[in-house]
Amino acid sequence: MNKIFTDQGFKDFLYWQYQDKKTFKKILDLLKDIDRNGYKCKGKPEPLKGELSGWWSVRIDEKNRLVFRIENEIIEILKCDTH
């Protein structure tokens, strides 16, 4: 699947790339798993409610979450930081 980022999602992605290689690798691993398994990926995927209805959240670590959705074989990343 192709991946696209919102502006905030891309800023978060770049932040982790330069600030914390371990967290960045975890994000890359999650994206690969989402690509293979969709919403049945690792990281305890949960559908979000309210204004983020339609988006899903998976755990990067205890504090941070990757928020994404899949539409038409495209993974859209909203953010990768604190939930």
Explain the meaning of each model-derived region.
Residues 9-10, 44:
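A short alpha-helix capping/helix-coil boundary motif
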Residues 2-4, 11-25, 56-65, 69-83:
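Enriched for short, Lys/Arg-rich terminal
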Residues 24-32:
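PIN-domain endoribonuclease scaffold, especially VapC-family toxins
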Residues 33-58:
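A short, surface-exposed loop/turn module that caps and links secondary-structure elements
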Residues 16, 31-34:
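Alpha-helix boundary/capping residues
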